[in-house]
A protein has these predicted regions:
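Amphipathic, hydrophobic N-terminal targeting peptides for secretion and organelle import
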Residues: 1-2, 220
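Hydrophobic ligand-binding cavity/cleft-lining segments
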Residues: 2-95
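Polar/charged side chains located within well-ordered beta-strands of beta-rich proteins
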Residues: 64, 99-106, 119-122, 130-134, ...
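Charged, low-complexity, intrinsically disordered terminal regions
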Residues: 75, 103-105, 109-123, 170, ...
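Glycine-rich portal/gate segments that line the openings of hydrophobic small-molecule binding cavities
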Residues: 84-142
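Short C-terminal domain-edge/linker segments immediately following a structured domain
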Residues: 92-95, 204-209
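Beta-strand/loop substructures that line and gate deep hydrophobic ligand-binding cavities in soluble
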Residues: 133-203
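Short, highly charged C-terminal tails/helix-capping segments
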Residues: 206-220
């Protein structure tokens, strides 16, 4: 596993975006994406709704933030039930929300197995970007040290929203802190995308529509 650059910096001082870009530029690491989904186009093509729905950029961003806090709800297929815990939530005057998170997630190359994932999370509300920085260990709100599983490299994920208010585009990319690029990891990501219904459409969007908007979806 590559050296962890994130564990020592205090939460308020740590620059999530800078760390993500540093890792994205490192030739040793394994990148996937960026991936792009036109939300309304996909909904219209693959689903019938119980009431009229124009999914907005505001909704998409709300979905991203809720998923950040509750991955066990919005990406339930990847999270061990009961394993999520968050702490340290802070909000700055310029619309930046920061917290830390631990959960047990399916491993990328052994999805039948779960491993502990420890993450620094920052949501930039003004530009609608949320960054997840995997780290080897953090001290939680109880003063205990929580440590990530070492069976796979640390990874970072960035999600953001683009497009017009009534034509939102969801985008994301990942970076795995490997010793050298691993071509198997992009294949694993491709397999995950293809497992969604429809393929490539993130499961957290239909979950949000049915759970938070109270609109039922029926596949076409």
């Amino acid at each position: 596993m590559s050296k962890d650059h994130t564990a020592a910096a205090p939460m308020a001082e740590f620059d999530h975006e800078r760390e993500f870009e540093r890792a994205w530029a490192d030739p040793r690491y394994t990148r996937t994406g960026p991936f792009t989904v036109n939300v309304n186009e996909t909904l219209q093509q693959f689903f019938r709704t119980s009431k009229p729905l124009t999914f907005t950029r505001t909704m998409m961003w709300d979905n991203e933030v809720r998923k950040g806090w509750r991955p066990d709800i919005y990406i339930a297929s990847a999270i061990l039930p009961g394993s999520v815990r968050n702490w340290g939530g802070t909000h700055s005057a310029d619309g930046v929300e920061t917290f830390e998170r631990v959960s047990k997630q399916r491993q990328w190359l052994k999805p039948q197995e779960y491993g502990c994932v420890v993450e620094r999370v920052r949501a930039y509300h003004q530009k609608q970007t949320i960054v997840f920085i995997g780290t080897s260990e953090l001290r939680d709100d109880r003063g205990a040290v929580v440590r990530a599983d070492t069976k796979q490299p640390l990874f970072y994920i960035e999600h953001w929203v683009e497009g017009e208010e009534n034509e939102p585009v969801a985008r994301w990319r990942t970076i795995h802190l490997t010793e050298r690029p691993n071509p198997v990891l992009p294949e694993a990501m491709k397999g995950m995308l293809n497992s969604w219904k429809p393929p490539g459409f993130p499961e957290f969007i239909p979950i949000y529509i049915e759970r938070d908007l109270n609109i039922k979806l029926q596949p076409r």
